[in-house]
A protein has these predicted regions:
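Conserved catalytic-core motifs of GNAT/GCN5-like acyltransferases
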Residues: 152, 170-187
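Conserved GNAT acetyl-CoA-binding A-motif
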Residues: 143-152
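A short coil/beta-turn micro-motif at the C-terminal edge
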Residues: 24, 155-157
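GNAT-family acyltransferases
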Residues: 1-122, 185-210
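Short, contiguous, well-ordered secondary-structure segments
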Residues: 100, 105, 129-139, 155, ...
Length: 210
C-alpha cells in the first residue's frame, strides 16, 4: 500500500486544455489519430522487444493497464484533450489530441516519476504539450509532493527537447539502452526537474503570470 495522496480518476484543467483519463468513448478518436499519423509516431514509439513475446495490444488492453496502474497509484495516464466549447460552453466530453503520462511513480524515500507525452501533429506547435506537461508537473510537485521528475528523449527529437528546455528541466546525461524504440534499444537524453528547482507554478510561468 502506497502513501499516495490521490484517488483516480484525476482531471486537471487550464482553460481549454484538459488532462483526463482515457475512456471507452475515446477509442475511435485515439485509433484514428494513431493510424493517420503512423509515420509520424513510428520513430519515437516504444516497441516490445522480441523476448517480451507480447500479443497484439488492443485499446481495451491499454485502458485496463492504465486503470490498474492508476488505481495502485503507480501512474497518472492522462489523455491530453481540448475543450472546443471553452469558455462559453464547456464540453462534457473533451476532444483527445494526445497524451501526457506520469509513469513509474515511486513513493517512500524516492518520491520520483517519469513523464512521457505525444500529440497529434495537427495540433503541434501551439504550445499545448508544454502546457499539458506543466499542468502534470504542478500536480506532481503540489498535490502529490513528489520530489523528482524525469523526462527521457531521443537525441534527434528536437521538438521534445524544446519542450523540456521551455519548462526548465535540466540535462542529466544519457540513459543507455533505456527503451526499445522502433525495433532497437535506444539511448535517451535525460532531463530532470526537482521540487526544489521548480517555480511555484509552471503553468503560471508559461502563462506569463510568474
Amino acid at each position: 500500500m502506497s502513501d499516495a495522496p490521490f484517488r483516480w480518476p484525476v482531471v486537471l484543467r487550464n482553460g481549454a486544455v484538459v488532462l483526463r483519463p482515457f475512456g471507452r468513448d475515446d477509442e475511435a478518436a485515439y485509433l484514428e489519430i494513431r493510424a493517420r499519423n503512423q509515420a509520424w509516431f513510428k520513430p519515437w514509439d516504444a516497441t516490445p522487444p522480441p523476448e517480451a513475446g507480447r500479443e497484439p495490444y488492443s485499446y481495451a488492453d491499454m485502458l485496463r493497464n492504465q486503470q490498474g496502474l492508476a488505481k495502485e497509484c503507480r501512474a497518472l495516464p492522462w489523455a491530453l484533450t481540448w475543450d472546443d466549447g471553452w469558455p462559453s460552453r464547456p464540453a462534457r466530453h473533451t476532444r483527445v489530441i494526445g497524451s501526457v503520462g506520469v509513469n513509474g511513480i515511486v513513493w517512500g524515500s524516492s518520491r520520483s516519476a517519469a513523464i512521457g507525452y505525444w500529440i497529434d501533429p495537427a495540433w503541434a506547435g501551439r504550445g499545448l504539450v508544454p502546457m499539458g506537461v506543466a499542468m502534470a508537473v504542478d500536480y506532481c510537485f503540489g498535490r502529490l509532493q513528489l520530489h523528482r521528475l524525469e523526462i527521457d528523449i531521443l537525441h534527434e527529437n528536437s521538438p521534445s527537447h524544446r519542450v523540456v528546455e521551455k519548462l526548465g528541466f535540466k540535462p542529466d546525461g544519457t540513459r543507455r539502452s533505456l527503451l526499445h524504440i522502433n525495433g532497437v534499444w535506444r539511448d535517451h537524453d535525460a532531463y530532470i526537474l526537482t521540487a526544489d528547482e521548480a517555480p511555484v507554478s509552471l503553468v503560471a510561468k508559461l502563462s506569463g503570470l510568474a
